[in-house]
Amino acid sequence: MKPEKMKVAVLAGGVSGEREISQRSGAAVAKALHSMGVRLVEVDVKSRQVEVPAGTDICFLCLHGSYGEDGTLQAELDTMGMAYTGSGAVASALAFDKLRAKEVMGAAGIPLAEGIAWTKENDWLPPYVLKPVSEGSSLGVHLVRTEVEAEKARKAAGKWKGPMMIERLVEGAELTVGIVGKQALPVVEVRPTQGFYDYRNKYTAGSTKYLCPAPMAKEKGLELQELAKKAHEALGCEILSRVDFLMDAEGKAVVLEVNTIPGMTDLSLLPRAGQAAGIDFGNLCLKILEFSWARNQKGVLA
């Protein structure tokens, strides 16, 4: 079925700390699909049990964070027999758990920053990154370079509801590679005007400079694209993802995480990478629908 003949439910909002960003992603996707002639309905998800409108052919998932991105929603939709965009329940759950994802990617030979589960007794000397095991949009992330910063981070982590992890700090360029279908999009470099690429810098206009394609040798760009595809496949991801990297001054890159429902706002990285590859936002959304529908019908990516 062509996207123009589908009835699409754009699911956004959700119950996580990323609700506002999810709403912005959903609104942007809905606007883009509408401009391409797709029949759609926007669904503001407000609980951990979604109600899909009658007659829906496929759900376009824009739910970032817990419930929408951790495999729970995907499992519910599988039970309903409802088609949806992106990775399945198992891959979504795996990618959302950063420690489990590290284990799998490490076993696949993918370069990673060293990381372990964090407790107050299981601590390192600075520098390091302290962050939630399962969260997105850099919520709850602390960069620790001094003992004073470490104490502040420990206090904040003690108030966080979920498990935390500690990771070696890699100083260098912040990079990302989007995957759509089987294609790795051009590398994007993000350069925040202050600090690192945290929640404020991600979603505040003018706070970050985006370089796409990133200024690097062609061979290095191809290397990162191949690493991104390898990470995507190692976790069993399908249709789309965004793989985040850090690269030091010597050109050594490590994978930080794989995002199975990347942001789709006007400031988001996947749409920017699509533009650099000659894919405008409307056609990017259509591709995601087409690939997801084919997967649902055939069990494979067409």
Kindly give the residue locations of the regions a language model identified.
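Active-site nucleotide/adenylate-binding loops and adjacent lid/helix of ATP-dependent enzymes
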Residues: M1-A12, L40, R48-A54, L94-A173
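ATP-binding N-terminal substructure of ATP-dependent carboxylate-amine bond-forming enzymes
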Residues: M1-E103, A107, T119, E290-V300
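Glycine-rich phosphate/pyrophosphate-binding beta-alpha loops
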Residues: G65, S138, T193, N259-A273
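A glycine- and small-aliphatic-rich helix-loop capping segment at beta-alpha/alpha-beta transitions
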Residues: A75-Y84, T146-E151, A276-A277
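Phosphate-binding site of ATP-dependent enzymes
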Residues: R145-E226, M247-V254
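Conserved metal-phosphate-binding beta-hairpin within the catalytic cores
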Residues: R168, H232-M264, G274
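Active-site "cap" helix and flanking loop/linker of ATP-utilizing ligase/carboxylase catalytic domains
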Residues: E189-S241, R272-A302
